[in-house]
Design a protein with these regions (language model features):
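A compositional/biophysical signature of low hydrophobicity enriched in polar/charged and small residues
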Residues: 1-136
């Protein structure tokens, strides 16, 4: 239920799952404290004027992997970053205002990071799903 509505009242959850409101409150509090659960707001980036969403694949010099990943993960426009297997060593999902900003971002930010050998961009043309739920 919290995946659908992170602000769902404890009373509604308790009623739906058949336990007391205090039980729900205690369990949610424990899951938050133990980092099993985090309640966040997910912005609609397009409505906020950020129309350019880009997946960036990077090939990196192996001995620079951790440094490059750390540097890129500290850039505000990078929404998620993952070290991977396959043709690319790192994938970064970047959200920008427009394609002009993408060019500036690549030239002034990504290309300046030492250790990156190859960069390939995959511009999002049409987002079909944006599901942050976890299958349980």
């Amino acid at each position: 239920m919290l995946q659908e509505d992170g602000l769902s009242p404890n009373a509604r959850i308790a009623n739906k799952v058949g336990v007391s409101e205090e039980t729900v409150r205690r369990r949610v509090k424990r899951m938050l404290k133990d980092d099993y659960l985090r309640v966040v707001a997910v912005p609609n980036t397009e409505k906020m004027g950020f129309s350019s969403q880009v997946l960036i694949g990077l090939q990196v010099i192996p001995e620079k992997m951790d440094i490059v990943a750390e540097q890129l993960s500290n850039i505000p426009e990078v929404r998620w970053l993952s070290v991977t297997t396959g043709s690319f060593d790192i994938f970064a999902w970047v959200i920008l205002k427009d394609s002009k900003d993408l060019g500036v971002f690549l030239r002034e930010t990504v290309f300046c990071v030492e250790g990156i050998q190859k960069v390939e961009t995959f511009l999002n043309l049409d987002l079909k799903t944006r599901n942050l739920d976890m299958v349980m």
